[in-house]
Each structure stands twice: as C-alpha cells, then as structure tokens.
Amino acid sequence: MKLAIIGVGNMGGAVCEGMFRKGMDAHYQIMASDASAEKLEALKAQYPKREITTDNKQAAKDAGIVIVAVKPWLVKPVVEQLQMSENQIYVSIAAGVDFAQLESITGLKNQPMFRVIPNTAISDQQSMTLICKCHTSTEQEALINELFGCLGRILIIPESKMAAATSISSCGIAYVFKYIQASIQAGIELGLTAQEARLLTLQTLTGATTILSEHGEHPATEIEKVCTPGGITIKGINQLEHDGFTSAVINAMKASM
C-alpha cells in the first residue's frame, strides 16, 4: 500500500524518521512530500533510498493512506490541492482542526478520517499518540492503530477529549524538557558538570517513570516515601509549592488547549 506523508517539518519529519527507522517502508511504499526542497533534501541525506517530491498531489495520488502533517492554517490550501477520494484514508496531524472542518475542506461526507496527534518522540518509536476516528471501518481502524502503535503507545479517544489530551502528551513533552533543562542548570550552579547533571536528571526521570508504569503507584505515594520527617526532600517539595510549581504545570496545560 502506498502511504503519503504531506509535510516534513518538525512533526511530519519525526513521523517519517520513526517509520524509516522502524523499517516500515518494507511494508508500505512511503512517499514524503513538502513544499520545501531543503527539508526534503535533509531527509533524503539521512535516508537516501526513500521517495521524496515537492508535488503534494503526486505524493497523494493512488495512496491508500494520506497523512497530512502541516500547520493548522495550511491544512485548507494543502488538502484542497490533493483532491482526495473517499477510497483514501485521510490522517490529519493538525491540532485544533476538527472533523467538521476537515469534511468542509475535502467536500467528502463519507471519507474515512483520523485525527492523530503524536509527540516528537515518534522519531524514536516512543510517542504517546492520540487517535480519534470518523466514518471509518473496523479494518481501517485496525490498520491505523497498528501503524502508529509501532511508533510508541496509542490512546483511542473521542474528539471531545482531543484538546485536553494534546496539552498533556503533545505539548507536555516540551514541559518535561523544560524541567530537564532547569534541573541541569541547577546542577551546574551547585557545582556539577553539565554532563554529570544531565546523567543524574535523565536517569532519575527514567527511574520515576518506571516506578509509576510498572507498579501503578500514585505519585503522591512515591513522594511520601522520599520525604522523611525533617529531611532535605520535604524542604525542596515545600519550596516548589511555595514557588507555584503545581499551579504552573496545571496552568500551562490549560493554556495549551
């Protein structure tokens, strides 16, 4: 089956990388398209044998799956150019563009559509990817679930939850990076080298997520285990709350919707 990826910017490029690294081009004829020849050449330099084009319409022609990974304000002009049919599965990776808008753009009332929101970790097959569907068959749903399930974890949700979930998984990865950056900066100020602070921070995060993933504990339970009475950790936790850490995280998530 031919699979077209329209747009190879930050997210579209990450999707391409994830698929190529996973070897999915052994199962799909993947063609990447972008208006920027420079972006395509950068992709081609990494993956020389892959098909690329600056002609979006040519990329989408005869494709069973068309993944449109362009900025939300570019969805309308790009999709109108593709002239897709109801025989093609349309996958939109554009936050905030709902199914009603997509149907209006395509002019097709029964086209199988998926809204898919990954995060940039999809390039390393570690994405948390959100999927919702419209006018799709069981077979089409299984196909898309398997496709993105190979690139991390997936969560099937109704469209009504897409904005909230996007703020946690797709935007949230940037907030995690922000914490990592702050932790490394703190380590340097405290006398560690950047490399030492980076190692300590990343492994600590890995350990924390492993505990929660493997044992299903509530974060508060694990915090309590570390905070001994009169100890240094509870002092740090109290300082975080004094400085508005919890409120800042919640407000960032809400602002992202």
Task: Enumerate the predicted regions with their spans.
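NAD(P)+-binding Rossmann beta1-loop-alpha1 motif at the extreme N-terminus of oxidoreductases
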Residues: 1-54, 58-61, 126, 188-190
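Small-residue helix-packing motif on alpha-helices
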Residues: 30, 40, 59, 193-200, ...
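Internal alpha-helical scaffold of NAD(P)-dependent oxidoreductase catalytic cores
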Residues: 101-112, 128-165, 176-214, 255
